[in-house]
Amino acid sequence: MEHDVCAEHELAEGVLRAVELNGRKVLLTRLDGVYHAVGATCPHAGGPLAEGVLRDGVVICPWHKAAFSVASGEAVEPPAVDDLPCFPVSVVDGRVRVTVGGQPERVDPIGPPEGEDTRCMVIVGAGAAGAVAAQTLREAGFAGRVVLIGREDQLPYDRTVLSKYTLSGQQGGEKTPLQDAGFYARYRIERLTGEVTALDPALRTLTFADGGQLGYDAALIAPGGQPRPLNVPGSDLRGVHMLRTAADADAIVASAEHARRVVVIGAGYIGLEAAGSLRERGLEVAVVAPQRTPLERALGPEVGHAFRRLHERQGVVFHLGQEVVAIEGDATVTGVRLGDGSTLPADLVVVGLGVAPATGFLRSVARREDAGVDVDARLRLADGLYAAGDVAAFPLYGDGARTRVEHWRVAEQHGRVAALNMLGHDVGYDAVPYFWTIHYKKRLDYVGHAGTWDRVVIDGTLDPPDFLAFYVRDETVRAVAGFGRDTQMAAAIGLLTDRRDWPVEALRQALG
């Protein structure tokens, strides 16, 4: 059905406008005098694209910074893995008209595999990087065998929701699983559940825990991380949990049904997200960590203290500067003993001490001190072998220093770049890293990668949190964090992509 939307002069160049047509939300734009209409809702989590930023013909979602072509609807940056629907637009007698329904809204970018191709592409790890790599191989026209190996017997899913929403019993809107079973069947992506115990780059073979082997023409190593254990007496008691998988989250939720008092060990992103989610469930929550300020190493003391105050206002109690020396209880946890001799009562303990790269099977490949692996800008580890996601130390945008970044969107970007290079393309990874963290339905966005900094410049208020934080080293902004600044942080991705040497005042003015 064709809809009269507006007069031709009513939509200014470069403006994003959302309209509802036939029950569908449509995003209308005008670029170089040409009108375009695509879906107005981000397929990742339902973000309102009209509140995003338009840059070089691409709209960046204000929520999680997925990006789409406004001309074709193509998803050009994750975390979205699906394109937007695209609608025909015409201008008749000075009126802009959009047709919704009655025709295919877009051409599926993944054609069915055709032709004879005997090559086998193997992906170890079915998380963000692995799932996107498998999809990209088919999108790029590869017609051979694609094998996606994971340790969990379920479809690849959005791991970010576990600490942010699953523990609270709420839903955040993220699409999970990433694709349904029909997708993998239709595009002949073989899903194997198993544990890889060895990889031989010279012979190009994988060995599984059951002794089976699989040869490959090119392989991607994307196993992600494994939780760092709590090595104290009593850490194996019932009611003590780590959080990495959906099964872990389900076990925590099951324990929470019968718990009243929770101790979270660790004040990093996962620990604080878990604390917030369990507090939203109505439990009494205490957080124990050796550092004096939450997230201080990642965000600095000022922003870290803002997170502490945010959680304290919700009733979370912090025990900082403390080491856990034992978990107390008989068969089931009853308390957490601290280094000062005190004991915190607990019916449930969640351990969030970070993760280490899950690279134990790479005995024939050189590994870093932190168990990661060094890759080049194409994410190549060796001939025919690539690495992506948490395990890959890649040349960071700007200075080229090899850096591991343990964040979902970066892993998805890695998966796409690695897959294209597995097929013989020459694509470098030079994106600006981005991640988000959510606490009590409030989100902090972080663009760039500071590592270390000389100073942090705060624009806004820390308590209550509503700010931009600029991380400055050698008089150049290395990263920007924003709390409650959705649109500005979407713009920051483009600005830091275009220019790598921003002085803080110039970037602050550019963000408005």
Which role does the model predict for each range below?
Residues 503-512:
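Cysteine/selenocysteine-centered motifs that mediate thiol-based redox chemistry or coordinate metal-sulfur cofactors
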Residues 21-22, 143, 182, 187-208, ...:
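A Rossmann-like FAD-binding core segment of flavoenzymes
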Residues 236-257, 331-337, 342-417:
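FAD-site-proximal beta/loop scaffold in flavoenzymes
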Residues 116-190, 228, 275-299, 491:
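Beta1-alpha1 glycine-rich phosphate/pyrophosphate-binding loop at the start
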Residues 117-122, 391-488:
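Mid-to-C-terminal Rossmann-like scaffold of FAD/NAD(P)H-dependent oxidoreductases
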Residues 62, 68-95, 99-122, 180-263, ...:
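FAD-binding core/adjacent interface of flavoenzyme oxidoreductases
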Residues 125-129, 244-245, 266-268:
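Glycine-rich Rossmann-fold phosphate-binding loop(s) that bind the pyrophosphate
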